[in-house]
Amino acid sequence: MDGRNRSNIVPGIEVYVVLKEDQRTGKQTKGIVKDILTRSAYHPWGIKVRLEDRQIGRVQKIC
């Protein structure tokens, strides 16, 4: 599933995100969503979330 639509993302699901420090390389990190930080319904680079381990990144793929 696509990580650009907020309606696809709910707390507790497993996702792949790109962290701020990994934006240049595109390295993806797997984690479980704790909070959704983006307020808009759509974001072209992915919805920003906080993972349960407190890392913040933009959702690239939903597992």
Predicted segments, located by residue:
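Basic/aromatic-rich interaction segments and small domains that mediate binding to polyanionic partners
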Residues: 2-63
